[in-house]
Amino acid sequence: FDEFGRRIFTMMTNRGKLDVIQGITELTPQFTRVQGISHVWDMRLATTSLPKETLHKVLLQAAGGTPDVETRKRIARFLIQMGRYEDALRELETLLETPELSENQKNDLQQSVRALKQLSARRLVEELRMRQKAGQYQTVHTLLQKFPTEGIAGEILQEVKELLGEYEKKSVLAQDLLSKLDSLIQTIDETPTRQLCSEVFKEIAADLTPDTLPRLAAFAQLADDQSLPPEERVALAISGWCLGADSALRRLPVALSLYRVRGLILDYLNEEQVLKRQEILERLRSEEGATARYAAGILAHMRPPKPLPEELPQKSGCFEIAVTWDSKEPPAHYLVQLPPEYHPLRKYPTIVTLHGLQTTPEQQIDWWAGEFDNAGNRIGQAGRHGYIVIAPHWTQDQQVNYQYSAREHGVVLAAVRDAFQRFSIDTDRVFLTGHFSGGDAAWDMGLAHPSLWAGVIVISGRSDKYCTYYWENAAHVPFYIVQGELDGTLMSDNARDLDRYLNRGFNVTVAEFMGRGRDPFSDEILRLFEWMSYQQRNHAAADFTARSMRAFDNFFWYIELLDMPPAVITPPTSWPPRNPTPLVVRGRIPSQNTLLLQVGAARTVVGLGPEFVDFDKRLNVTINAQRVDTRDIQPDIEVLLEDVRRRGDRQHPFWAKIETATGRVSGRKP
């Protein structure tokens, strides 16, 4: 836009290039109305999406064009209403230098400047708290030390002082605990035991952060208790480090066994050969700490098992990784952008973003995390909020639309599961997103695999084909749909399914932009992050009903389908189906240790975890009104580790599994 709020919008039509002259006709702190001058077109933009320089020029011209006292005051008021306190403050400070101001005017302006400084300082404190919550401790500590003090209220400065005090307190506590632990280790008589304890100590000292410090809470409580032998206090530190403070133990042999078990688990998860995995498993079974309960705790508190590749040159925290999704197909690739101060022992929320057919994975990461600056760092919303961004390259050359295929699902799911093994991802906060055809894919994959996602964000995407039959699956995964009023037939195409969602009270948010067409909608990004902050995956749904029509849409929470009947399967190449009959899967957990399942496949695998099963009590599982024999079901470390190898979820692995026939028709060929 120029200073008069006009621009030329150029688009390609079937008649060639078309230039549309537009002008800003209404400017509010929330939205900007833009209308066509040469053509009929009425659209809305978020005012925050206008560059600061452009906004200032337009405001100045709208207020009369002359930067006099009243004009600058009007601009400052507008900026305050937008929440841009720093910009308003600069405007008023510039105004104070105007010689024609009277003393009363200067006093009034100085009072406004003081109030703006408080608002700006308060928002800076809120920003620092958000960055602290995102794990950016060094950045926050540095900014707290440089926090402006001139003209800032004592209440805010006291809050800053308390935040700095928390840092100093944690730093002193960490050094004190390390010193005490080191001293206790040196009192252990047995040399091999002392050496192994020293090895663990070096790891703790290297990885002790504000996120890992709570693991030593049990040790901190009893570190000075002289009634406990040094070995027991050391055991509290080592076991707490491996399992978390709530599971800390006093027996040093068991604590050291946990440390060895963790190393063997790491070897197991990285070993590709079955025979070698069995050898590792035998060594594991000889360890006292190799129970399913201990192994689950270790998995939840260990580093990701697979190593990181080399960073891309001059691109901080950015990686490109190849992943095998099918042994008969060439590897697929995906990009990953890590947030600032990433640490492998902290869990991070994650965005899985799918590009359109005319865009790239790099552009998707740029949209969420910002572009690289000259220093090779990104300054964008994903890093600010502490999110990992994953962008699979899911399309093929010359592809013209989303194909709803096994290949597309396989590439995306393989990238996600490989990322689980390499990066410290909070598997309860993984969000699937997509633009354009990537939005079509996100809508389909979100409904096909609702148990994987904390939420699904579709931007300029379409609900089509399988989505029409899977719509009830949306009851179990939140959706955020962003679309433009003038994006062809998109709104009418999506209307039926959106009506179904909204009329039944599903957790669905729909943002429709007036006068906007096929657009990436970058002006919605702050609302998207606010929405994501409230969402979390239901990893063990107590009551769900889901539908499937493809052989690869075969897992829902703790149920996996095997041998689906041919009558319900409709491959994408056979669309549309003649007689669509989706397979129905129902799971209900009315009480602990009771599972009531309805499964339309011939065989099923039921995963069992501690969230809904107490393995010390009798287990009741009913499938299709038939009781399943569960007398021999016990937690098994091999089942647990194989589940982690396959699904990558180290936060909620299954401790045991039941594989059984269901009495339904088999999909196998004779």
Regions flagged by a language model, labelled:
Residues 550-670:
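C-terminal beta-sandwich/jelly-roll accessory domains of carbohydrate-active enzymes
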Residues 347-350, 354-421:
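Active-site machinery of serine-nucleophile hydrolases
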Residues 1-210, 636-670:
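Compositionally biased alpha-helical segments
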Residues 175-348, 638-650:
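A domain-start/cap signature at the N-terminus of enzymes
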Residues 488, 492-593, 600-603:
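C-terminal catalytic histidine-bearing segment of alpha/beta-hydrolase fold enzymes
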Residues 421, 428-475:
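Primarily recognizes the serine-hydrolase "nucleophile elbow" in alpha/beta-hydrolase
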Residues 474, 480-483:
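Short beta-strand/loop motif that positions the catalytic acidic residue
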Residues 340-346, 400-436, 448, 452:
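Gly/Ser-rich "nucleophile elbow"/oxyanion-hole loop immediately N-terminal to the catalytic nucleophile
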